[in-house]
């Protein structure tokens, strides 16, 4: 007999029963660290929280696919690598290694997949281009933003 799982919905601050889209394969995606500097306590909190959720889901459902990305290219990384006079690759390898050591120290399980941003640049550019073409995103000062007012289910999203 499976126990129900209740999670807090941050949009209404109420506990709601977790109803999976696919009971045969629960899928969870978590934004991982941007590896520009040594890991800190702010990196540890989501590690621990989502590790507990991952373990709970694995004990409740037969299959759980957990994806946590590693952002290994962005403005902070470029700036930090320039300040340290090392390549972005050298910096991100060093910081990613420290992050993985912390994961191990905190007894966090490895996600099912851990993609790095640099492994998917072409796909990201393609997706961003499509979002802009369809009017769901726009560029401003070399940044791309979602056009959240175009979302159909506005009650499920917060925006200013």
Language model segments and positions:
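NTP-dependent nucleotidyl-transfer catalytic core
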Residues: 1-160
